[in-house]
Amino acid sequence: MSVIDIFKKRLQAVSKKPVIIFPEGWSASVLKAVEMLNESKLIQPAVIFHNRQEIPANFDKKITHYVIDEMDLTSYANFVYEKRKHKGMDLKEAQKFVRDPSSLAATLVALKVVDGEVCGKEYATKDTLRPALQLLATGNFVSSVFIMEKGEERLYFTDCAFAVYPNSQELATIAENTFNFAKSLNEDEIKMAFLSYSTLGSGKGEMVDKVVLATKLFLEKHPELHQSVCGELQFDAAFVEKVRLQKAPQLTWKNSANIYVFPNLDAGNIAYKIAQRLGGYDAIGPIVLGLSSPVNDLSRGASVSDIFNVGIITAAQAIK
């Protein structure tokens, strides 16, 4: 069963469907996905428009929608100001903040008016995630994961979209975020590899040391996982049993790793795209982990189907 089917089943089982807001109401692709999500009855989509002229004639007005030019944004601006004044934001800046659709969406999530947000078809990643980080950060390190699927195979690649140069502690937290996410999907057996250009001491260098320490920090927190987590490993040793027996005979895994923790964004981002384009894997994500409520970023090349799927994922994340 694909991860999208798992999430659909979870959403079918809850009586109160999560409300997920899509702030890019001027995007035809977003509106088509919203229409499909509304028809699915799995979530309650909501949309933000700048003005009434943006609303297409065929838009279903029964779908919850916000028109910024017609809203009294005072209470939202006051909320943002109180949240951000310690960082130097003044009231005028807060008023400007909530007039931006992505920022208003994050505000509605923070106020629990809605349960989650999907954005990024028109916005750059930084403009989707910055408001979310400003209002929904928990103090924990925020990271992301791609679910890579091919047939019945499911792998988790992290972090391929968010953390540029994580240090050892951040890398351990990235691993923990993804481990917890995979467990939430009821993965029967988790094998996690902290990846490097070295396998268990075959190479030396600062980057190797970082990965070794990250593995150590993770296992200090989860000593029960010593048989399931290993680092530092090269990808071929983590993925191919024959190579693993040669390079790391002391590692007694019966199955290959299904969580791959990359040492930096360069490695992770390149790897997931190679797996997608050359390996034929479906890349589902990036799924943002570590916020108080779910906010997920679309690729600007996202199809209607991609937007639909991210809406399903975000709604499933919102289920408490």
UniProtKB/Swiss-Prot annotation:
InterPro entries to which the protein is assigned, alphabetical:
P_Ac_Bu_trans, P_AcTrfase, P_AcTrfase_dom1, P_AcTrfase_dom2, Phos_Acetyltrans/Butyryltrans, PTA_PTB
Task: Name one matching Pfam family.
Answer: PTA_PTB
Record's catalysed reaction(s): acetyl-CoA + phosphate = acetyl phosphate + CoA
List, in alphabetical order, the Gene Ontology terms for molecular function in this entry: phosphate acetyltransferase activity
Provide the top EC class. Answer: transferase
Q: What pathway or pathways are given for this protein in its record?
A: Metabolic intermediate biosynthesis; acetyl-CoA biosynthesis; acetyl-CoA from acetate: step 2/2
User: GO CC terms on record?
Assistant: cytoplasm
EC number per UniProt: 2.3.1.8
Q: Name one GO biological process term.
A: acetyl-CoA biosynthetic process
Which keywords does the record carry?
Acyltransferase, Cytoplasm, Transferase
Predominant cellular place of this UniProt entry's protein: cytoplasm
Compartment(s): Cytoplasm
Q: Which domain of life is it from?
A: Bacteria
- PANTHER family listed in its UniProt record: PHOSPHATE ACETYLTRANSFERASE
Membership in a protein family: Belongs to the phosphate acetyltransferase and butyryltransferase family.
Name-wise, this protein is Phosphate acetyltransferase
- Protein's organism: Mycoplasma genitalium (strain ATCC 33530 / DSM 19775 / NCTC 10195 / G37) (Mycoplasmoides genitalium)
